[in-house]
Amino acid sequence: MSIDLKLSRFNRIYRPSEALEGKIIIKTQSSISHYGIRLTLKGSVNMQVRGGSAGVVESLYGVIKPIPILNRTIEVKPSGKIASGTTEIPFSVTLRQQGENLEKFYETFHGANISIQYLVNVDVTRGYLHKSLSTTMEFIVESDKADLLQRPIPPEMVIFYITQDTQRHSLLPELKSGVLFFYLRIGGFRVMGKISSQCSLAGPISGELTVETSAVPIHSIDIQLFRVESILLGEKIATETSLIQTTQATDGDVCHNLTIPIYVILPRLLTCPTTFAGPFSIEFKVAIVISFQSELSQLHKKTDSGTPKLWLAMETLPLELVRTK
């Protein structure tokens, strides 16, 4: 005996003004009696503050009361019997009904401290002497088309320069003073380019970079995507920045004065439109990280390359993500 949910869309993406449609599939070897089949839709913003992202006072809050977005239960079938074999029961529920005073439908997002999740649950109640049947499935919510920008936005580009003088952390001596080459000391490095500062969630982060000069050979250049989650706690704000994704742009030393394209696909469930709500906010950053060849770096292969280190040079820029039609 089993129960399963099958939604009408394989990608499980729905908009608040649309109906969530699908089938409840029940398989049983013999007919069973039940006291009703109920479908429950739930959506909420779940927040927590971990010890590493807040001080002692903030960490006392722990898990914060969720912000409810959607909570609705409907009876799909009254009490009765389910015949043996496979039974399919269709359902259709509009997510946002007219006249309802609901919280804003934020887009689905799974972060470190903030999670925006929508679930559909079905229960087949069978009384005290029999085990009830139940199953839950997550569906994804995206903004209504009426709330989106009318046309795709061209990606806004920002120009960046990465040199030894733009770094706020300590660097290896050879990166600053250079190396000795035929009795001449060649020093420093300079990388310039441009990258998206605003882009659509349906498109990539794009841009280009050029290594103009580098006294020390380059090991790799990575494009890193970060999320910045902020939660309001009383009069304070707890903020945590965490790495979402790393995309390698180059591997090995790079030819100088050669234009290298930047093209990064955004992960669906780990990103959402840049959001500024009252109790929380979700922002994003993009970093260009240059790793230079160094014996010291070989001893720290397992460390997070997003953290400033002696053999790394980086530039971090804000990134606004938007949903377009």
Annotate the PLM regions.
Residues 1-325:
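C-terminal beta-sandwich interaction modules and adjacent acidic
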